[in-house]
């Protein structure tokens, strides 16, 4: 029987983006939990940290009291860092370029982030899929049939505007961004009884990389993934999969 690893992805992602990484994990199976405002949880809205925790616990009911291994990427990693404090059932935590610092540390205010996100969603519209696909090809380090299918799956056609746009609930995701601001990252000091793996992309601003590394305690296993940017598990699924398998074997999962 395949062992399941749960996955909380970043803003605007889709479960199909996990396929390449999942193929590297042998007898392990990645199961995405769609964040509020995404996928199967498109109409879900959480208003504060308490509601976020209650939503997550509801998602976890299917797993009874079994110990969980969960991966978080980007926004998903930030939220996971807090959820792990409230859900002791989560024993093994894998953070993919997330959960390491507060955006205030970069003097990036919540107001500016909300404005930037709204502008991005407004501008991320395409008259046809060919135009969108060309944009996606430029956004990723590699391109294949799976990325094509995953990219198309995260879009929807707006009949009123006659454009393709991200299939997400804008109101819900803006709430999530505000909720993230209530979390004081990192949360490692509150998770000393958990197993934690941090994977960082090689290609990023050196100042930001140094800040992330500074926030990671020496007892936490941390690796830098070559040939990868922020979309670390999409850019280099082979190396990410190898590191996850190796780490899990050392903690006897």
Predicted regions and their residues:
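Catalytic histidine-centered segment of alpha/beta-hydrolase-like enzymes
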Residues: 228-237
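Conserved alpha/beta-hydrolase catalytic His-Asp/Glu region
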Residues: 127-179
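Conserved serine/cysteine hydrolase catalytic core
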Residues: 160-216
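Active-site loop/oxyanion-hole signature of alpha/beta-hydrolase fold enzymes
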Residues: 31-71, 242
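Gly/Ala-rich beta-loop-alpha elbow adjacent to hydrolase catalytic centers
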Residues: 72-76, 80
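Conserved HGGG/HGGXW glycine-rich cap/lid loop of the alpha/beta-hydrolase fold
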Residues: 2-42
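Short beta-to-alpha linker loops that shape the active-site pocket of alpha/beta-hydrolase fold enzymes
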Residues: 34-39, 99, 228-229
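Flexible "cap/lid" loop of the alpha/beta hydrolase fold
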Residues: 93-127
């Amino acid at each position: 029987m395949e062992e399941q690893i749960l996955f909380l992805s970043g803003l605007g992602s889709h479960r199909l983006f996990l396929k390449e990484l999942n193929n590297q994990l042998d007898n392990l199976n990645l199961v995405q939990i769609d964040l509020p405002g995404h996928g199967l949880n498109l109409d879900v809205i959480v208003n504060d940290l308490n509601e976020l925790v209650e939503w997550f616990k509801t998602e976890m009911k299917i797993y009874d009291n079994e110990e969980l291994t969960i991966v978080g990427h980007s926004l998903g990693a930030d939220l996971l860092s807090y959820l792990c404090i409230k859900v002791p059932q989560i024993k093994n935590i894998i953070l993919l370029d997330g959960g390491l610092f507060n955006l205030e540390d970069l003097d990036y205010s919540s107001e500016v982030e909300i404005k930037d996100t709204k502008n991005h969603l407004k501008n991320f519209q395409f008259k046809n899929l060919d135009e969108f696909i060309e944009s996606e090809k430029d956004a990723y380090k590699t391109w294949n049939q799976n990325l094509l299918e995953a990219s198309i799956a995260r879009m929807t056609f707006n009949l009123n505007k006659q454009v393709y746009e991200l299939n997400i609930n804008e109101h819900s995701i803006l709430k999530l961004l505000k909720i993230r601001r209530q979390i004081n990252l990192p949360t490692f000091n509150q998770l000393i009884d958990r197993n934690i793996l941090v994977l960082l992309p090689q290609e990023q601003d050196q100042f930001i990389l140094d800040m992330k590394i500074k926030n990671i305690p020496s007892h936490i296993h941390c690796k830098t993934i070559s040939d990868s940017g922020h979309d670390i598990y999409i850019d280099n699924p082979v190396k990410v999969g190898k590191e996850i398998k190796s780490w899990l074997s050392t903690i006897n999962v």
